[in-house]
UniProtKB/Swiss-Prot annotation:
Part of a membrane-bound complex that couples electron transfer with translocation of ions across the membrane. Required to maintain the reduced state of SoxR. This is Ion-translocating oxidoreductase complex subunit D. The gene is rsxD. One of its GO terms (cellular component) is plasma membrane. GO terms for biological process: electron transport chain; transmembrane transport. It holds the Pfam family NQR2_RnfD_RnfE.
Length: 352
């Protein structure tokens, strides 16, 4: 009898890359819907802009590299990159910003390294950080959520603001950014950091309209819960593994709790960290990128915990209010080292 020994891999996953990417896109629907509800139609316009620009940029590079355009675009990775960047920037940011960010993400952060599977850094976060460093004012100019907002532009007005800087009635960005009593509204994390530096007490800060939510900032808590719902669905579909989200959230919660207990007058409470900013989006949709995250189970736990620690440190002591994007990229740098020291021992061989 002749036995044929096939080469590895010996187990096969029937789900192709395009299907996994499609599942992630579908899981993003609750988060997108929440952002549309609280921040207006600008989010949808940015998603459409980002989708078109990422596809065009990827097609151009593939054409120059003489690779199959149609086959590569079908993997949906470019669409996901555009989506993640679009939901991370303010809804009424100028059109050229999302185009610049997505083009940089696709061409420099992805295709320059060889395309999908070769890039060491998350492309969407590279694009986001480039925009944040280059245009900090525009990237931190979020509308107040509709619960406390005076002006939330409709679909047509959102298009006009994004492309021309003002609505049909003449309202410019400064007018639209004004919230209750003419006070400019930022994100809960940005408001907290700015107010603490100005010498305000936590008790005073918690009286601001932006913190009128039940658990955290108005609107932002529901946006984060919506992204959490999508992330749990991804876990149920087994499109992602639990190690990174769990270790990230547990570490962030633990650091925030300890910091708040030791310094309640200067550091934010744990619920603000967990339900504000890009916490849930980062935990389930960004950090779990299979290309740029650790590949071993122990490594995933370390990777997620490191990102959680970095997010808390940047939010609490850094110069930027959120920190998820920087934490992701810094954690990406450590992946080769983490994988090297957490690689499983080959059966029958001694360690070392």
């Amino acid at each position: 009898m002749v036995f044929r020994i096939a080469s590895s891999p010996y187990t096969h996953n029937q789900r192709q890359t395009s299907r996994i990417m499609l599942l992630v896109l579908l899981a993003a629907v609750p988060g997108i819907a929440a952002q549309l509800w609280f921040f207006g139609w600008g989010t949808l316009v940015q998603i459409l802009l980002a989708s078109v620009s990422t596809l065009l940029a990827e097609a151009l590079v593939l054409k120059l590299r003489k690779q199959s355009v149609a086959a590569t675009l079908k993997d949906n990775s470019a669409l996901l990159t555009g989506l993640l960047l679009a939901v991370s920037i303010p809804p009424l940011a100028p059109w050229w910003m999302v185009v610049l960010g997505t083009v940089f993400a696709v061409i420099i952060a992805k295709q320059l390294y060889g395309g999908l599977g070769q890039n060491p850094f998350n492309p969407a976060m590279i694009g986001y950080v480039v925009l944040l460093i280059s245009f900090p004012v525009q990237m931190t100019s979020w509308l107040p959520p509709h619960e406390i907002a005076v002006n939330i532009p409709g679909f047509i007005d959102a298009i006009q603001v994004i492309f021309s800087g003002h609505t049909a009635s003449g309202a410019d960005m400064n007018t639209l950014h004004l919230g209750i009593d003419g006070i400019s509204q930022a994100t809960p994390l940005d408001t907290f950091k700015t107010s603490v530096r100005a010498g305000h007490s936590v008790e005073q800060i918690m009286q601001y309209p932006i913190y009128s939510g039940i658990l955290a900032g108005a609107g932002w808590q529901w946006v984060n819960l919506a992204w959490l719902a999508g992330g749990l669905w991804l876990l149920w579909q087994k499109a992602i593994r639990w190690h990174i989200p769990l270790s990230f959230l547990v570490t962030l919660a633990l650091c925030a709790t300890l910091g708040w207990l030791f310094s309640p007058e200067t550091l934010a409470a744990p619920q603000i960290h967990l339900l504000s900013g890009a916490t849930m989006l980062g935990a389930f949709f960004i950090l779990t990128d299979p290309v740029t995250a650790s590949t071993t189970n122990r490594g995933r736990l370390i990777f997620g915990a490191l990102a959680g620690l970095l997010v808390w440190l940047i939010r609490s002591f850094g110069g930027y209010p959120d920190g998820v994007a920087f934490a992701v990229l810094l954690a990406n740098i450590t992946v080769p080292l983490i994988d090297y020291y957490t690689r499983p021992r080959v059966y029958g061989h001694r360690k070392g």
